[in-house]
Amino acid sequence: MTTILKHLPAGQRIGIAFSGGLDTSAALLWMRQKGAVPYAYTANLGQPDEDDYDAIPRRAMEYGAENARLIDCRKQLVAEGIAAIQCGAFHNTTGGLTYFNTTPLGRAVTGTMLVAAMKEDGVNIWGDGSTYKGNDIERFYRYGLLTNAELQIYKPWLDTDFIDELGGRHEMSEFMIACGFDYKMSVEKAYSTDSNMLGATHEAKDLEFLNSSVKIVNPIMGVKFWDESVKIPAEVVTVRFEQGHPVALNGKTFSDDVEMMLEANRIGGRHGLGMSDQIENRIIEAKSRGIYEAPGMALLHIAYERLLTGIHNEDTIEQYHSHGRQLGKLLYQGRWFDSQALMLRDGLQRWVASQITGEVTLELRRGNDYSILNTVSDNLTYKPERLTMEKGDSVFSPDDRIGQLTMRNLDITDTREKLFGYAKAGLLTASSATGLPQVENLENKAK
């Protein structure tokens, strides 16, 4: 069986991930006119720039959908977002600012839940709006086939017939109008935006050029913190975790994770927290650039890692960061449910997240400027009395430290011998000042 269909399978049911935008609207109408039987599936991911989800399936029916369904994906999306925080599943960072993999998380949820809904309706051909140059085409491909082994893929944007007829937004708009739909193109922005409840991605067009900065972006989840005319008063915030799960913000307990994430977004968004500018490596190894928003994820991540550093030992923290980066890359590649990812997730959630209980107090200011004011947890292994510089009972004595330092003589001796060995091999030069070999000065070497 051919998995990827290059041309429209007339007479067959085709499920399309329908956003209600121009691209998917024109594609749905075109498929119906060409003899296919389109079914529309819309994911409610809590997109901050969408205010009427119920209207989207209605529009799909108007454009010729045999059936149209709205799938509420918010609960699952937030669950996966919290899991990513618990595991530190983030591998793209620049200057200490993190991309929280919000688009990959959204694709993991959309790609599985929409295909599961299609399967219920007996629809085994799936199309979406991803292009062949991006990451999403592979993410959706993997998640779709994981969910339905009989799935076939048809994408209008890979069909030369569709491209020849409706290859641009102007052509698609004219097509909709000619078919009796008063569809007006939205005002063109200097970049494109994709969002869900966890975060927003701004990329392409002007943002492909590195001399275009965050200042051309109009945030949809936060504020223009770089604009001095925007007043952003400082705000003290408390975040509480229980066994790795965020349960309270500013003393208010949430039984609904969706409501908790919405409130975290509101709090962080008031300050522009969690915005970052990243150059990243796409799945196909080419570099791309994006500007990201994730105010709620950033707020929870800061509090979680503060508790983490106070509760776990150094080696556990090192493994958390190392395994988290590995897991973040797998998530980015569309492998969130692969066995190697599940193995990493299980270990991080079981042995790291389970102990993260406590409350962190922060002061948020502008953008990613914040201070940690207090950290409280019954699980803290940070105990100031162990290393206090003041007089008092100590857990170890000066004689204990002398013994510990004396034991270091063994590896210091080994290291000294290694340095002289490197010098004999010509890798290091002798220093007249210290008597120890040293790396040759590059400036002197150039002379």
UniProtKB/Swiss-Prot annotation:
UniProt keyword annotations, A-Z: Amino-acid biosynthesis, Arginine biosynthesis, ATP-binding, Cytoplasm, Ligase, Nucleotide-binding
EC number(s) from the headed UniProt entry: 6.3.4.5
Tell whether Cytoplasm is among the UniProt keywords: yes
- Which Pfam families does the protein's record reference? Arginosuc_syn_C, Arginosuc_synth
**Which of this chain's residues are annotated to bind L-citrulline?**
99, 135, 139, 192, 201, 203, 280
Q: Which GO terms describe its biological process?
A: argininosuccinate metabolic process; L-arginine biosynthetic process; urea cycle
Compartmental location: Cytoplasm
CDD domains per record: ASS
Catalyzes what? Answer: L-citrulline + L-aspartate + ATP = 2-(N(omega)-L-arginino)succinate + AMP + diphosphate + H(+)
Q: Which residues bind L-aspartate?
A: 131, 135-136
Q: Which domain of life is it from?
A: Bacteria
InterPro entries xrefs: Arg_succ_synth_type2_subfam, Arginosuc_syn_C, Arginosuc_syn_N, Arginosuc_synth, Arginosuc_synth_CS, Arginosuc_synth_type_1_subfam, AS_cat/multimer_dom_body, AS_multimer_C_tail
Q: Name any GO cellular component annotation.
A: cytoplasm
What pathway, per the record?
Answer: Amino-acid biosynthesis; L-arginine biosynthesis; L-arginine from L-ornithine and carbamoyl phosphate: step 2/3
Entry binding sites for ATP: 17-25, 43, 129, 131, 136, 194
**Gene Ontology MF: a single term:** ATP binding
Q: Which HAMAP family match?
A: Arg_succ_synth_type2 (MF_00581)
Self-association state and partner proteins as the record states: Homotetramer.
Q: Which family does it belong to?
A: Belongs to the argininosuccinate synthase family. Type 2 subfamily.
Record protein name field: Argininosuccinate synthase
Where does this protein come from, organism-wise?
Answer: Salmonella paratyphi B (strain ATCC BAA-1250 / SPB7)
Organism lineage reads as: Bacteria, Pseudomonadati, Pseudomonadota, Gammaproteobacteria, Enterobacterales
